[in-house]
Amino acid sequence: MFDIGWSELLVIGVVALIAIGPKELPGVLRMVGQWMGKARRMASEFQGQFQEAMREAEMADLKKSFDEVKEAASGFSPAGMMSSLQRDVDKALDIEGVDKPAEPVIATSPEPVASVETPVTPTTPEPPHAETFVEAEAHQAVGEPLAIVREIKPEPQPQPADGAAPAEPERLKDAKAS
């Protein structure tokens, strides 16, 4: 504690024996021991109070964080979620604003009105021509990946009894991968 070695303790003992004397030395040592005991008790009491304050502060922090979590979790109760969902559905089903006729709009802006002489250009695009449609399909088909499928080899089929020609077997070549 005070970093006193044996040699220093021996020097202190010899000085105390010479200064105090052998008759009163046991009483003085007892009194010094009591003071040391009181100092240790005070130090341990202070340390205990300090640790208690730290635990209380830590518990207050934990309680605060627990209260925050509890408050946040209270909004997630099934009844609370159902009531919020019910409110959303009620708002979606509210048709009072839909039934009212639209109010007439009065044009107060100083925008120039198109004259009758000005030809109006259509805003919708023309339908695609057959040539452009085929080109568009070909362009789209080039960009898509193809799946590799093996061709089905025709199996020998029995000849019909009436002498008709057999039907052409189906062949699968390239199929679009999708």
Curated annotation (Swiss-Prot):
Gene Ontology cellular-component terms listed: TAT protein transport complex
Biological process terms in GO annotation: protein transport by the Tat complex
Superkingdom, natural source: Bacteria
Parts of the chain that traverse the membrane: 1-21
Keywords from the named record: Cell inner membrane, Cell membrane, Membrane, Protein transport, Translocation, Transmembrane, Transmembrane helix, Transport
Entry-linked Gene3D superfamilies: 1.20.5.3310
GO molecular function, one term: protein transmembrane transporter activity
InterPro entries membership: TatB
Keyword ATP-binding found: no
Residue span of region Disordered: 146-178
Biased composition (Basic and acidic residues): 168-178
Membrane topology, as annotated: Single-pass membrane protein
Location within or outside the cell: Cell inner membrane
Keyword Disulfide bond: no
Task of the protein: Part of the twin-arginine translocation (Tat) system that transports large folded proteins containing a characteristic twin-arginine motif in their signal peptide across membranes. Together with TatC, TatB is part of a receptor directly interacting with Tat signal peptides. TatB may form an oligomeric binding site that transiently accommodates folded Tat precursor proteins before their translocation.
Quaternary structure and interacting proteins, as annotated: The Tat system comprises two distinct complexes: a TatABC complex, containing multiple copies of TatA, TatB and TatC subunits, and a separate TatA complex, containing only TatA subunits. Substrates initially bind to the TatABC complex, which probably triggers association of the separate TatA complex to form the active translocon.
Cited PANTHER family: SEC-INDEPENDENT PROTEIN TRANSLOCASE PROTEIN TATA, CHLOROPLASTIC (PTHR33162:SF1)
Protein family according to the UniProt entry: Belongs to the TatB family.
Protein name as annotated: Sec-independent protein translocase protein TatB
Organism listed in the record: Bradyrhizobium sp. (strain ORS 278)
Gene field: tatB
